[in-house]
């Protein structure tokens, strides 16, 4: 801040006297005493000096009284140097700690400086007195200033928010937070005052009659709201008892357009009772004190002590008068627009609230019923509110309540009546306050839609801690908790998240300031519920009380960290909450009632029906009482928009307040917050007193220290790349190369050029971040740069003005000398006799000469008149012919328009065909989906088949059980052993088969690999697929045969037959459905034919792009025609005829080409139509073939099913026979079954497991069948999709070729038009150049002759000045060399100091490590040392920055020194040259003086002759031989044009409508141009305003630069003294740095002066040289021109003849061009033929595509014909590929032809341009009279250029569409790749299926062998049974042992053995032991 002396009274409270602070004595005292801060109970912290260190304790001496004390090291806090005393931003403090912050705030507060910056926000301490710092003069001081330019103030915060809103277009908010009485409301008013003054809407507006009405109303809204919403409390005389959010809306220009006020939680209970020494709302006291007698009688007012609701009577406020405040409130209402009736009605309601309190009730003797002994007060109340007294008393004492469906009268007790009256009084006052806010908003918010952005000012009740706190205090403290959480989140969380989001190096710091636990304790809805949720829950229960609420709260939240039971006031308080500002004890009396807020329905209804309209309006929403929102769709009432809640939903006060607070927080989060932290200095409301402990508590709670720390450690300043480059590129002029560069790269280059320390900045993803102060330093550098530029500009301007004045003086001096010489000569000559004779004879000679000249002129005049009449006749004839040509041109244009319409129709038809094609593709997709549905049905049939097989397996199990029952024990043993051996053999066989299958699998894999390679080759694919198909069919047939054999031996045929019958019926239904689908396809085919006809009509939509381009071309042609018509309106007939003829010929050629194109396109469309009809016929044929194939497939399926039925019937008969035999055997073997039951069970388990495995294998076999068929189907589908995609790619490629051809054509048309425009522009430029050259030459001749002598004298004086300046420069250079040597010495000393500082930093780090190892106070020591380390690193960075800046300045100084040396040498050379030139000029001066006199006389004579000759030349130019030239030319052009018109007239008769369309398009373009022009003007206006604002700011900054530079120099000199031990050495360094800085500044100033002088001398020398050269050149040119003027008359005839020859040559060249264009047209016809051939090929490809689509319908039956379709599709795909290859070759050939034609066209255009230039150069001398016309034409040419640019834009759009088509092609390629991937997946599935098939075959063979063994064993057993029976019959009774021994016979390898019983048992046990492994 600049140093100020003799400060005025207001500035004493803003600015700090830095002279006192920078006192060297205080600095030395601080250094010597080693001052620190120690804790103090009284002062918070006290200053002391360290005397002795004793381990962890330190002996200190208090600075105030000299006492000594021992203090722990951890309790000591460092003291800042004296220069930081009363610092404006506490982030600048080197030692940041609580003591330093408190000391700084205290010093500033005692000096009257109440505002202090604390990093990113502002701290304000309530002064408790009025300060003169809020006047309009102070506002003007802060207006438009940046934050660092002015001292801290609420106005600076407001200005910053206002500027950010305008620049960033982001909504702002200013949040004034703090405890009650801290000054939030006053600061809010000052913010509104500043914004109303700065953004006044009447400034710059037209209506000056109502100046600032909106601003006045905005300022007067606060007094009204304070009267009705503020009250005196113990802590604050003007405490806001409600919260408000004031939203001020601004328009785009920054003017206020309206405002809106939202209020929160009015403390309405204050209206009925107040605490001790407190007052109710101000309006009650103001009304009773300030109302007049008449008003008192109207309002029935009484004294203060007569009202019960004024609990404490009248309590005055010191320094305020209620009477005066009442008048101010009334005046504010009038300004706000309140009517007299509204004010009176409001005051009546206020009086009625007081009257409510005076109503007294009495308890009757025998009952508890209340009564009203006296109704005088009730009468007054009813009179004021417009109610009936009887009804009111009845409603209070015996209200009607609803019981069921009926209403009954209920008597009230005295307590209930008193409560009802108080509730009515509170509700009435609350509704009055809501109406007041709504009325103010209605007055302020007059323009809702104009507000572009807003600034919100939040003034809400501050944090309150009373002795006992109620529900209102809980809501207020809850709000402040949320606001503090928003502050913490914004300052600490979001700031660091942005660092991480931008990717810069940053370690996340947790400051431990999260207030969410306390907020959750209050607002959490559940798990566990918070205070508000529990309160709402208790309101639902009828028997709930405040005590039950407290009990539930303790039960739910008793363990919460922020919840405690009260300790001090255990009897009075109920619970305690730990807020961020401290512990608060709450008493829950009447909380349920306050939350529910019940009201008497009867009285509310009476108030709603009041005779007073105002009262009735207040109670309009009577349905919302008792907290029950029963109205869902309420309209806007007097209180604004109604609450829209669900019907019947219970709404408590807590819920409503929570919702409004949530909305407020959402609004604040969407704005950019600006925080103002208000601090209360003491609770006594005394000025000049500051309680340090109170302030410290508030600073800790508000997070001030943390905010300062993150501001210092972080990167608070950030700027986006583009803005940084735009603003600071002036500092690095050559760092960024020309052209486009990424913003990040540009910023990196700029940073490198600025040579900033890497620690001072970070580069993120989209922004560049700086530490505090770096951006301000860059701003200063930028201001210095701009100052240098402005100084240089001023010097140039002053030098120019001085030279101009000097030249004028020199001119006057030479004129005086000439007059003197002439007078002296005349005085000598006048008495000479011969002179007298000469003067008498000379006039006579001149008279005779004049007569001769007049005769000659008369003759010439007659000749010229004759020529003029002749030329006029020719002109009329040419104009008549020109009109004919124009008519013919119009006819041709109409014909062209009709032809283009035909072409448009053809293009639309083509578009419709394309749309039809798209529809057919959609139909194809539908058919594919139906095919998929059929596949699903087939899958269902397969599932049913599986079910049948499961039933068959069940039958087989039953059959196995019967067989097992018949088998005997011995045979089972034999068979089991045989099975084991056979299984071992089968395992070997299976291994062999497995190896074979592996080999086959490898072969299959090789074949599949071959298939994938053959897919790329496309021709060999069909053969490989056929091989794979045959092998798969063989495998499938083998599987089916084996399955049938098993089914023959296992199935129970009766059930199978029924199942198969059902299956046949299902198949027949399926065949019927397929037949129906065929019929549907036939119907769809007919629909396709109809849609194809519609598609032909829709095909024309594709020509829209071409029509647009043609329209643009026609618009350009119309512009050219208008320009030519402007030419024709002038008199220069010959030039007009020539240009018109060229334009007409070019237009005819363009019309010819367009006509041929349109004819070709119509023929092509006809051919397309015929081809479409052929395609439809082929589709019909393909459909018929498909139906035939389908019928054949159905017949084949029927035959196969018949054979299957026959085989099943045979199997059924065999099974029946077999079953009969088994039943016979069953009866004989039942007895044997009982004996063998135990062994049979074991065997049955083994059998069951094997059968279960067999079932699984059968199911796997069936799944494999399905997978194989599915794989075949998918393979076919993929092949078909590949073909389809290839066809689509071909079609897209053809479409792309057509689009490219169209683009080439449009580009040619645009190029032709551009060439025409360029030709005309070149004509204009050359003509204007000739005109300017002629005029400048004439002026130069006159000026140069006059300035010769003046320049000679100037050069002599300049030479003398140069000699003097060179001598001065040499002396100054010697001085600068000495100063440079001195600076080098100072820099070396600085480097030594830097090294010492680094050593000190290392020592400090060692000390830090030692401190960390301390045992007892680890945490405290670590934190303190961390803070010290941060401060030291900041200081070290600062020192490094200073040293780097000095090094940069030294480099710059060296560069300047080298430049000065070069400049001095250059000036020495120039001095020598100037001396030589001066000597030469002296010799030439005398001869030039003589020549000048002669030239002046000759000049006058030649000027007369020149004028005469010019007149003659102009007449000749306009008339000479025009007739003879033009007649022949026009006749020839007429014949050619008539012939062309006759040829084209028959073809161009239908083009009339196109002309009207072009005119409409022209009108639309003009309208668009006007709109764009208006928008551009508006943008220019806003940009100019911004530039003016920036210019004003720059001028202010330039004026303040010197003072700021002085401050910066002092700060840099003092910054070195950061370390105590280095103070003595650093003082010497400071002196050296100051001396070096002063010397450097002097050197820089001298160098700048020398540079400016050098540049002036250079410019003067250059001007002298240039003027000398120009004099010589002009003298020579004047001589040449004098000679050429004599020869010009003779050359006129020759030029006319040459122009005639040039015209004939131009006509010949035009004929040649016409022939060349005709040849190019023939070439174009060949191109069109090639195009037709390609279109025919495209049609053929489309036919093939439709054939492929028809093939897709053949996929319904995929079981037998999949491989056939694969073969056919592969062959078709190969054919398509070959056809596509051919079409690609043809396309490449066409492209080569196009390139050749383009080259030819370019050659033709170059030839045309060269010939046109030749004709133009021949005719250049004839265009003198058309200068004014050509200027007008230049403007029209500019318009034509705009049209050309539009055409280019449209061409770009066409190219974009082409790119879209290419993207579609890429998408098709991706689909193709996906299809290939799907093919590979199917191959893998096929391999897995083959493996499963091998496993199934092995298991099937195994089962078959087991079945054979079982049947053999069964037969053997039956034989043994028969033999045993025979023995029994023969042998008679046999003993049991013998029979047992006889039965135990084993058959092993064909031999029988007889075993004993013991052996048998042992064998049985062996068998049992060996069986379990088998079952496993």
UniProtKB/Swiss-Prot annotation:
Query: Which keywords label this protein?
Result: Acetylation, Actin-binding, ATP-binding, Calmodulin-binding, Cell adhesion, Cell projection, Cell shape, Coiled coil, Methylation, Motor protein, Myosin, Nucleotide-binding, Phosphoprotein
The UniProt entry's coiled-coil ranges are 845-1976
Residues modified as Phosphothreonine: 1960
Where is each Myosin N-terminal SH3-like domain found? 31-81
From the Swiss-Prot or TrEMBL record, state where the protein is found: Cell projection, Lamellipodium
- State where composition is biased (Polar residues): 1967-1976
**Database matches in InterPro entries:** IQ_motif_EF-hand-BS, Kinesin_motor_dom_sf, Myosin_head_motor_dom-like, Myosin_N, Myosin_S1_N, Myosin_tail, P-loop_NTPase
List modified residues, type N6-acetyllysine.
Answer: 442, 1241, 1301, 1645
Q: How is it modified after translation?
A: Phosphorylated by ABL2.
Q: What tissue specificity does the UniProt entry give?
A: In newborn kidney, expressed in the mesenchyme and ureteric buds.
* Ranges for region Actin-binding: 661-683
Q: Which family does it belong to?
A: Belongs to the TRAFAC class myosin-kinesin ATPase superfamily. Myosin family.
Q: What does this protein do?
A: Involved with LARP6 in the stabilization of type I collagen mRNAs for CO1A1 and CO1A2. During cell spreading, plays an important role in cytoskeleton reorganization, focal contacts formation (in the central part but not the margins of spreading cells), and lamellipodial extension; this function is mechanically antagonized by MYH9. Cellular myosin that appears to play a role in cytokinesis, cell shape, and specialized functions such as secretion and capping.
- What does the annotation say about its assembly with partners? Myosin is a hexameric protein that consists of 2 heavy chain subunits (MHC), 2 alkali light chain subunits (MLC) and 2 regulatory light chain subunits (MLC-2). Interacts with PLEKHG6. Interacts with ECPAS. Interacts with LARP6. Interacts with MCC. Interacts with KIF26B. Interacts with CFAP95.
Q: What is this protein called?
A: Myosin-10
Q: Which organism is it from?
A: Mus musculus
The gene behind this protein is: Myh10
